[in-house]
């Protein structure tokens, strides 16, 4: 076995250019499969996280119509009409062992923010200390909102780099004044960090985002009911359970009349996971089919070059048979060479696939996840290509008659 592998490597490296060109189809096919699987797994995880709260084991509890009234033309429900959340309910949720954090915050996507003649239309968050405990940010200029800011009506704001670029083309934003819905705010910090509401297809803070203390929210929007309730579980296994528990406690604080109109609920994560998985399977089948064509072409190339190799080594085969080598020895030697050739192509394809996936994450900022089963499967598949397409040349070599082979010039 080891001798067959040694001879295979010797043959491959004695014809380097020919071997590389032969492996090219296999390399491209395997690289495409690895890149596709890595990107799909990364996008799948990011999509699921974006739908439940964008990571950190957090899930959003939403206030929405009961029994589908909104869709059927019933009364519309707005966050402005949501009843205040009792402090006892907040304490009850936080006291549950499954809950690591809880934040009642505000989110608006319709605000117009001005500085002189420049305008931005960011996502505006009204937050407290609990929010930053759950979703840390990284300050690049200035400072964060302090505890004193967050517990007061200080009209201060943190903006991300997208807002800074839109409102302050010269890049100088600190201590400048901006106006939001007619209310002035002073910029105290600029941040850059991945946002929990960010689109999976966009880069870090491709969307404009800013933070204000939640106590100033009534000045901006005219109401004082949280639009978002985020629950952070102690582990990923408890995300759904913690969210349902929080929704139940919040609903217990509503009257029967309020429950008839609207209620708190959470997304079904299992349903989300199934939908994402279904989409990924369909997409993977489509792209996998395209990659398989490359592997098929690569396999045909392997068969062709092995037939050429058999022809070139006809006298060598004749000598070995004349010295007593059996058919299965000759067959196994050429089959081993084909498998070694495609296995090297498979390994290079895996490395190239990870390289392509990593490059795509730079061009289109999104994660990729290394899939060990995909790597193992790709290597096994590349070996299978060698066996399937190397079998015919190997059989041809093993059937050569010693006398005819020795006569070959």
Curated annotation (Swiss-Prot):
Organism: Bacillus subtilis (strain 168)
Highest taxon of source: Bacteria
Gene: yvrN
Compartments reported by the entry: Cell membrane
Family of the protein in this entry: Belongs to the ABC-4 integral membrane protein family.
UniProt KW Transport keyword: yes
TM spans (from-to): 20-40, 283-303, 344-364, 372-392
Membrane-protein topology: Multi-pass membrane protein
Protein name: Uncharacterized ABC transporter permease YvrN
Keywords annotated in UniProt: Cell membrane, Membrane, Transmembrane, Transmembrane helix, Transport
InterPro entries hit by this protein: ABC3_permease_C, MacB_PCD, Macrolide_Exporter_MacB
Main location: membrane
């Amino acid at each position: 076995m080891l001798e067959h592998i040694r001879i295979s490597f010797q043959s491959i490296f004695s014809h380097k250019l020919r071997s590389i060109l032969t492996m090219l189809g296999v390399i491209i096919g395997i690289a495409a499969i690895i890149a596709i699987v890595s990107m799909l797994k990364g996008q799948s995880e990011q999509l699921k996280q974006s739908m439940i709260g964008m990571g950190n084991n957090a899930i959003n509890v939403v206030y929405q119509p009961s029994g589908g009234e909104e869709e059927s033309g019933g009364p519309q429900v707005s966050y402005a009409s949501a009843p205040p959340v009792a402090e006892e309910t907040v304490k009850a949720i936080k006291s549950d062992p499954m809950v690591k954090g809880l934040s009642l915050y505000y989110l608006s996507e319709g605000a117009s923010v001005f500085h002189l003649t420049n305008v931005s239309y960011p996502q505006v968050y009204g937050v407290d200390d609990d929010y930053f405990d759950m979703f840390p940010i990284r300050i690049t200029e200035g400072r964060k909102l302090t505890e004193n800011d967050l517990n007061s009506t200080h009209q201060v704001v943190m903006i991300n780099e997208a807002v800074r670029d839109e409102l302050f083309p010269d890049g100088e934003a600190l201590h400048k004044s901006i106006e939001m819905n007619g209310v002035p705010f002073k910029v105290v910090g600029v941040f850059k960090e991945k946002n929990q509401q960010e689109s999976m297809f966009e880069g870090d803070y491709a969307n404009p985002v800013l933070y204000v203390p939640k106590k100033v929210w009534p000045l901006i929007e005219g109401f004082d009911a949280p639009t978002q309730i985020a629950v952070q579980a102690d582990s990923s296994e408890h995300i759904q359970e913690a969210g349902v528990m929080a929704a139940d406690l919040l609903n217990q604080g509503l009257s029967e009349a309020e429950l008839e109109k609207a209620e708190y609920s959470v997304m079904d994560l299992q349903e989300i996971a199934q939908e994402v998985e279904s989409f990924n399977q369909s997409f993977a089948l489509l792209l996998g089919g395209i990659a398989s064509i490359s592997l098929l072409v690569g396999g045909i190339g392997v068969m062709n070059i092995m037939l050429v190799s058999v022809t070139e080594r006809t006298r060598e085969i004749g000598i070995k048979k004349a010295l007593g080598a059996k058919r299965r020895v000759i067959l196994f030697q050429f089959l081993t060479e084909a498998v070694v050739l495609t296995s090297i192509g498979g390994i290079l394809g895996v490395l190239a696939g990870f390289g392509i996936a990593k490059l795509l994450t730079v061009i289109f900022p999104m994660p990729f996840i290394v899939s060990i089963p995909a790597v193992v499967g790709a290597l096994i598949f590349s070996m299978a290509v060698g066996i399937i397409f190397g079998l015919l040349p190997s059989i041809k070599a093993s059937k050569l008659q010693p006398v005819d082979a020795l006569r070959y010039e």
